[in-house]
From Swiss-Prot:
It comes from Homo sapiens. Component of a SNARE complex consisting of STX5, YKT6, GOSR1 and BET1L. Interacts with STX5. GO terms for biological process: protein transport; regulation of retrograde vesicle-mediated transport, Golgi to ER; retrograde transport, endosome to Golgi. CDD domains: SNARE_Bet1. The keyword Phosphoprotein applies. This is BET1-like protein. It is a single-pass type IV membrane protein. One of its GO terms (molecular function) is SNAP receptor activity. Its main location: Golgi. Residues 1-86 are cytoplasmic. The keyword Coiled coil applies. It comes from the Eukaryota. InterPro entries: BET1_SNARE (IPR039899), T_SNARE_dom (IPR000727). The modification Phosphoserine is found at S9, S37.
Length: 111
């Protein structure tokens, strides 16, 4: 580089170095802009996912309270007399059969 620098005037060398610095600064600025855009996209996506998870939390809370009430009513019915036990067994068998029929029709609909 010493031979190259001696062959040109000091002003020309400074101009070449200045142009190289500007080119590298522009390249760095474009990379920083891309990184900033990427960071903003990640932030937006994280906020959307947090809102979605908050909505799911409220859905699960309401479903938990619904299932808790159903289990309490089912337990009360199971603890009552012998006639209700026959009804309970009939309902359980009916629900199981309905589940298998529904799953059969859904599997047929997919194929």
């Amino acid at each position: 580089m010493a031979d190259w620098a001696r062959a040109q005037s000091p002003g020309a060398v400074e101009e070449i170095l200045d142009r190289e610095n500007k080119r590298m600064a522009d390249s760095l600025a474009s990379k920083v802009t891309r990184l900033k855009s990427l960071a903003l996209d990640i932030d937006r996506d994280a906020e959307d996912q947090n809102r979605y998870l908050d909505g799911m939390d409220s859905d699960f809370t309401s479903m938990t309270s619904l299932l808790t009430g159903s289990v309490k009513r089912f337990s009360t019915m199971a603890r009552s007399g012998q006639d209700n036990r026959k009804l309970l067994c009939g309902m359980a068998v009916g629900l199981i059969v309905a589940f298998f029929i529904l799953s059969y029709f859904l599997s047929r609909a997919r194929t």
